[in-house]
Swiss-Prot record:
Protein's UniProt name: Peptide chain release factor 1
Assigned keywords, A-Z: Cytoplasm, Methylation, Protein biosynthesis
Role this protein plays: Peptide chain release factor 1 directs the termination of translation in response to the peptide chain termination codons UAG and UAA.
GO MF term (any one): translation release factor activity, codon specific
GO cellular component: cytoplasm
Presence of the UniProt keyword Translocase in the record: no
SS bonds (residue pairs): none
Presence of the UniProt keyword Cytoplasm in the record: yes
Record family assignment: Belongs to the prokaryotic/mitochondrial release factor family.
Modified residue annotations for N5-methylglutamine: 236
Species name: Mycobacterium ulcerans (strain Agy99)
Length: 357
């Protein structure tokens, strides 16, 4: 393991440098920089801790082998330590493997109703609530940037910004990046008088929001900016002035809305940040053709034929069609209990990456 050891030497030095930097009050006068350093330190701390455990286990194994040469009672202990060393070695190798560069990032998530009329809008609202509950379970913050509601209180569309708190090694993107695509629901709609099960669909688009948006140039002449009076669920006013902002990026057709900041200027600034993140994601997809299918085609059309997951109410079943995952706890899933599903998706993604490498 010569190469990983060399890598570890570099990471140990970086870990020590960050530890000193984070102890300096001067750094914390720059909150964004301190947060970025804290996240990096948290990830390195896991690697360093595993490496130190591996070093200690190897030393114990060497001692056990020496003792076993003259005392058979140490043979079993040596075997246990060999298994421990192999386990830690595997963990460290996994930690040192190339990672998605956005794993520590926050996200912007869009939910859009599709076919199914009012029922689709109600299902889109169920999905938005599911993600909000999941974020709450993890102590993350959720901001509703914009929403268009239906007559029965569903979502025609909604845009959420989800951000982790504190210094975490893995951010929101690492857990929620597989949610983009078409979600299908099978249930009896509230508008159905005959008790028949209907199928509807809603689409989800999710993309990372890096702390620093790269070299994305946005020409003001490519933008159409509209100002309007926003309204939230149930028609209640969110703003007392026409402060909501809708920005359309004409070359791509991307539309970003923001209505929940305190002023029109703040809404425009936030909408531009989201637009920049969206355009950066598109640029990265084009630069990485092999990976582009993962996100670029998340919502080509919100149609039942392009589904990633089905929520079947009569059978209390959730099925993720990409990995064949099934569970019969639909009510818990819709209440934000998504970790088992997300773990399965991450494991499948990891296996696919290993097969491609």
């Amino acid at each position: 393991m010569a190469a990983p050891v060399q890598t570890i030497d570099v990471l140990l030095a970086e870990h020590a440098d960050l530890e000193r930097a984070l102890a300096d009050p001067e750094l914390h006068s720059r909150p964004d920089e301190a947060r970025k350093a804290g996240r990096r330190f948290a990830r390195l701390a896991r690697i360093v801790a595993t490496y130190r455990k591996l070093v200690a286990a190897r030393e114990d194994l060497e001692t056990a082998h020496e003792l076993a040469a003259t005392d058979e009672s140490f043979v079993a202990e040596a075997a246990e330590l060999e298994a421990r060393v192999a386990e830690l070695d595997s963990q460290l190798t996994d930690m040192l493997a190339p990672r998605d560069p956005h794993d520590a990032d926050d996200i912007v998530l869009e939910v859009k109703s599709g076919e199914g009329g009012e029922e689709s809008a109600l299902f889109a609202a169920d999905l938005a609530r599911m993600y909000i509950r999941y974020a709450e379970r993890h102590g993350w913050t959720v901001t509703v940037l914009g929403e268009t509601t239906s007559d029965l209180g569903g979502y025609r569309d909604a845009t959420l910004a989800i951000a982790s708190k504190g210094d975490t090694a893995d951010g929101v993107w690492s857990r929620m990046k597989f949610e983009g695509g078409v979600h299908r629901v099978q249930r009896v709609p509230v508008t159905e008088s005959q008790g028949r099960v209907h199928t509807s669909a809603a689409g989800v688009l999710v993309y990372p929001e890096p702390e620093e948006v790269g070299e994305v140039q946005i020409d003001e002449s490519d933008l159409r900016i509209d100002v309007y009076r926003s309204s939230g669920k149930g028609g209640q006013g969110v703003n007392t002035t026409d402060s909501a902002v809708r920005i359309t990026h004409l070359p791509t057709g991307i539309v970003v809305t923001c209505q929940n900041e305190r002023s029109q200027l703040q809404n425009k600034i936030r909408a531009m940040q989201v637009l920049g993140a969206r355009l950066q994601a598109i640029a990265e997809e084009r630069a990485m053709a092999d990976a582009s299918a993962d996100r670029a085609s998340q919502i080509r059309t919100v149609d039942r034929s392009e589904r990633i997951r089905t929520y079947n109410f009569p059978e209390n079943r959730v099925t993720d069609h990409r990995i064949g995952y099934k569970s019969h706890n639909l009510d818990q899933v819709l209440d934000g209990d998504l970790d088992a599903l997300f773990d399965a998706l991450a494991a499948a993604d990891k296996q696919a990456r290993l097969q491609q490498s």
